[in-house]
Amino acid sequence: MSASRSRNKQSKLCDDERLDISRDEFNRFQEAFGKEEFRKLFFDYVDEIQDPENRKIYESEITQLEKERGVEVRFIHPKPGFVIKTALDGELKCFINIASCEEIQRPKNEVATDPSSGSRGLSWSIPMAQTTSRDDFDAKNNHCKVFDVVFHPDALHLAMRNKQFRQCLIDTALDAIEREYKVSLDRANLKFPKLDYKGIPRPTVIRKMADNPTAEEQEPHPLAHMFPTKPPAPGKQEPRVLPMKTKPSPVPEFTVPRYTIKHSHDVDLSEYTDELDAKLHVTVPRSLVVEIELPLLRSTAECQLDVTSKSIYLFSERQGAKYRLKLDLPFIVDDKAGRARFDTDMRRLSITLPVVRKSIQEQAQMHETLRHFSREDSGVELHSNSESPVEEDPDGELSDSKADISETSSPSVAPANSPFLKSSVHYQLPSKFDCNVLDNVMAFVLHVPNVQPDSIEQLREQRSLHLKFATIGSGYYPTHYAFYVELSAEHEDSSIESAEAEAWDNNVVLKLCLNSQSETPASYLAGLDATELKEYPVHGQYHVKSKGKVNAKKDNAPLDVKFERNQEGHALKVTIRPGTKEEEEDKENQDQEPESDQQQQQQVQNKKPGKKQRKKNKKERSLSESACADMILQEPLAKTNELQPRATFKLPPQRKQRSYSECNDSTGRSHRGILKRFSRYGPRPSMSDSWSSIDDSSSYSCSVDASGTSLFSQSFGGIPEEDRSDAGLSESCKKTVRFNDHIMKQVFRLDSSILGQRKKNQKRRDLKLRAQQRRLSEGDSVDYEETRGSALKQEENPSRNCNDSGLDLTGAAGAHSNNNESDAKNTMMFEMDD
């Protein structure tokens, strides 16, 4: 850029063609000037050219030759007047010679009226002539430029007597040079040296067509046929009149010098790597080089320079060299480590300032920010209110889940006067959103990921709320969303008291708190704005104050099952019929009475048992006994209200045995259920595995094996996945799987990887399992011996097996010893898993 600028400057300032000489020609000149005879002839030629008499002869011959062509030629010989010194384009020193010649017309004036003020005055017409610019040298042998402007001698005489006319003459000369050569002159720093003329006066020529050519002049030239036809000349050519400026431009007191700012870089190979922060400082230079052109200053002692971290201030009040520059730097620099140098030959001030880059801590923070921007989504939703299954860290490395999640942003409220949605921005409605009601709180979940917390704005009214926010996609391009919600007209007493919006990783949660007098809304109006509304139903309604246990029993007890055992026929009669309201009320009363007893038992169970107590609990068979006891309580209720049975099965007498959702027949073949088993010595199942434990507050289940081939299973209670419209029971085999409504969610820290956290938790679980194996190794062997002994006693005395609490009935009265041993082993494993 600087090279092209210098070439343009040389082409603009150096109009004379450079001497193009070859090496051979230069050698010939060198040999010729070495001869005395050639030097004598050369000096005689120079004296002949500079002789005034010879120049007059030369000019008369040129005039006669041009006259034969019908052109009048006048030679202008400038006579010295005064000299103006200034700067050309703020880079080069130049001189302007104000000279005079008799060949120039006299200045003329006429009376005129000023259109702006209405005052009368004189309007001057000042003829002038210009010569071509030429290169010269100043007193210090520095390169400069010289211009000649020639006026009539009367004009110079008036300038010497009238100060205003002198200034008008100077402005006319400066305007002519700027207009003709397309340059800029420094008018604020004009000097008038004690010179009459700069350089050697050189005549110039003014040509114009002759008014009355002679017959000889009109004769065609002998070689005219060889050239193209000359266009006809106009009748009378008027001289070009340059209009004067009606309003003179104000001359500034100080001149702004010409300057350039260069960015200096070093070659750093680390910028060519594939790291995220490799090209962070590509656009930040190592230093700034500021070059200021001061052609009218001889040294820096004549100016004042002040450099700060963000600006440069230069001031010079020397007469003829008044400069003032205030420059704002594009980067923050270290003003203490900078240096300045003034080139006296080029009259140029160079200032080098190192750029202040960010510290190592700031660069590390920026690198961490870029790393978080580029990280991929782990697919794990973070919720502050959900329970975390991650085990507690004894060292306190894992913080609270609420601290790991990004802080909730407080959305700004837009002013009511300005429009909420900007007309220049395109807004979208979230493609998916849900609404749930909890008492007097409406919760909206807008499924929009990567929402910027600081972009959330809301406009709340009495019965409506307008929300807008923005997201950043993978290409770092913002996408704007808007959501307008309004309460339905059915609930006129409802109003919005407060609103809260929270931005999460994958959605936005909007909570609307309604007034206490409002009813639970069944629907709402939503859209992009108030003009585009659509009615939506509320998906879920939850009431915290209601008795969930009583309602669950009312809803989940639609059937009544009756069992009758015939000792003579060795048959079991099962009757299924829908329950009545009276029976349900009796069940509710019976459940409310032992409610206090159950609370006391739960408090006792919550206490941590001792080592002996844990061994006793292993031997108890609480699972099947509790289920059977509840079914025995229902038998007298079934006898009071007998209805026509739905299905009756006659089964042979079978031995009762404890079953864990499995049915074993006499042949040794077992039907394995879909419910999972797990041991304390193996890894725990995942959260999606089902559990076969009996939920006392919701349902009861039993399994009956008929003839060793059919499996009958019925749930006393409602399971959300079942179709409750069919009250009957199919004769085909049914297996019921019940899932927990509570969803466990894993929470991970932002500053740790998922694989690393998984390995850490697995290692901690392995250590706990090893400790448990060491503590329970001796107790497990004792339990196995006791369990095997009890199984052998049951084989010897089969009559006692009839009092067993299990419900699994097999066809054979006496089973093989192999089956008993396998049952005993399964029993031992079941107790160990508890």
From Swiss-Prot:
GO annotation, cellular component aspect: cytoplasm
Compartments where located: Cytoplasm
Subcellular location, principal: cytoplasm
Alphabetically ordered keywords of this record: Cytoplasm, Phosphoprotein
Composition skew (Acidic residues), residue ranges: 389-398, 582-596
Chain intervals with Basic residues compositional bias: 608-619, 759-773
Compositionally skewed regions (Low complexity) per UniProt: 597-607
Described function: Required for cytoplasmic pre-assembly of axonemal dyneins, thereby playing a central role in motility in cilia and flagella. Involved in pre-assembly of dynein arm complexes in the cytoplasm before intraflagellar transport loads them for the ciliary compartment.
Name of protein: Protein kintoun
Species whose genome carries this gene: Drosophila melanogaster (Fruit fly)
